Swiss-Prot record:
One of its GO terms (molecular function) is R-SMAD binding. It is found in: Nucleus. It comes from Homo sapiens. Its main location: nucleus. Residues 61-89 form a coiled coil. PANTHER family: ANKYRIN REPEAT DOMAIN-CONTAINING PROTEIN 1, ANKYRIN REPEAT, PH AND SEC7 DOMAIN CONTAINING PROTEIN SECG-RELATED. May play an important role in endothelial cell activation. May act as a nuclear transcription factor that negatively regulates the expression of cardiac genes. Induction seems to be correlated with apoptotic cell death in hepatoma cells. The gene is ANKRD1. This is Ankyrin repeat domain-containing protein 1. It comes from the Eukaryota. Gene3D superfamilies: Ankyrin repeat-containing domain. Keywords: ANK repeat, Coiled coil, Nucleus, Repeat.
Amino acid sequence: MMVLKVEELVTGKKNGNGEAGEFLPEDFRDGEYEAAVTLEKQEDLKTLLAHPVTLGEQQWKSEKQREAELKKKKLEQRSKLENLEDLEIIIQLKKRKKYRKTKVPVVKEPEPEIITEPVDVPTFLKAALENKLPVVEKFLSDKNNPDVCDEYKRTALHRACLEGHLAIVEKLMEAGAQIEFRDMLESTAIHWASRGGNLDVLKLLLNKGAKISARDKLLSTALHVAVRTGHYECAEHLIACEADLNAKDREGDTPLHDAVRLNRYKMIRLLIMYGADLNIKNCAGKTPMDLVLHWQNGTKAIFDSLRENSYKTSRIATF
């Protein structure tokens, strides 16, 4: 069997015995096969130069380029911090973003309380004080008397006026509660409203016909009570409704006497501005001005005493 060398197979050249060339087909004799292979290699080289990277490398470069473009776009979209206006814009954007992320909790409305059992008097009075409207409504719907009271003759209306529970006051008045009902100290609803300081309740009572001149057992008017408790808006409304500025209580004190004694500066200014008399004397023969001087003298005496004691202490310390 004839053995061919690789060189003879590729080049088509004969070996020394002149036998190899006879094996090759006629078309590939005289080096034509070598020329064909060389031409094919040259074509492969051109393709390699035109496409120097593989397909995987092309995809990797494409992804990198896309990421770079996205990053550049994001940077361009960002606000440049060049002045205070830019800073303000950034802050507002941050706030909006935070607001969008914050979920608003859904607040469920409490289910209306349904009272099926009968309501007794103590529970009814307590409900008026604690603003439990369903309990009050149940008591009234059972045709009970709205003017029932405790041992001090204080009604549900008195209690609701003190605490400023407007809805309960309205419900009681619709049921026929007496506005002028007096407790053990002869205070009416208007006294209790002035003591509690709720202007809306006070306005409702006056609109429903409550007597602005009503006096309690100490002969105090609603204006006296509002001044003593420091409820400025209530006092101002009572004055606007023509309450008596110079009404005297059992001690002969006017609202101005009370304001001076309690050192309520805003009340003093309010009463004087609307024309309160500075020269009215109480049962002790003192005018509001006398009380001011008495207060000033008393304060001066206290400071003089403190200064004298301080002086004596310092002299003792020197010996």
